[in-house]
């Protein structure tokens, strides 16, 4: 049984809260080294988002584009980063959870559980 899933969670560290309603685009690097967009999703009220479910998530190199400019604009906050790309190698047969810790002038990410 394929248990692979791909998910994210965004926390806005400038206010100490989850970042809700942020659009996230998932792309896969194809065999000719070009990005192929797979889908767009949106974080829920808790800042969480299931990006790809089992059966939709083959091994490969993925790019997550977090469209955070609109999130900050809605709050009348200037940001240096209108979008953030995170590229991950998802070659193991396991769940991948990639959180984003966000503020208007910086960000950090890590391999979550």
Q: What label would you give each PLM region?
A:
Residues 23-27, 63-65:
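Beta-strand signatures of extracellular beta-sandwich domains
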Residues 63-113:
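Feature of secretome-associated and extracellular-like proteins
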Residues 57-62:
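A glycine-anchored, Pro-Gly-centered beta-turn/N-cap motif
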Residues 14, 22, 39-42, 53:
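Short hydrophobic alpha-helix segments
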Residues 1-20, 28:
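Beta-strand-rich domain onsets/edges
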Residues 33-50:
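Short, acidic Ser/Thr/Gly-rich low-complexity loop/linker segments typical of extracellular
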């Amino acid at each position: 049984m394929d248990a692979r899933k791909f998910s994210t969670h965004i926390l806005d560290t400038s206010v100490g809260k989850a970042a809700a309603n942020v659009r996230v685009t998932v792309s896969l690097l194809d065999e000719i080294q070009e990005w192929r967009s797979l889908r767009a999703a949106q974080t829920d009220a808790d800042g969480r988002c299931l990006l790809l479910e089992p059966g939709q998530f083959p091994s490969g190199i993925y790019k997550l584009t977090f469209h955070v400019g609109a999130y900050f604009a809605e709050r009348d906050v200037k940001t240096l980063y209108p979008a953030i790309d995170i590229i991950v190698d998802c070659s193991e047969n396991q769940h991948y959870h990639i959180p984003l810790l966000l503020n208007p002038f910086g960000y950090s990410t890590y391999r979550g559980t």
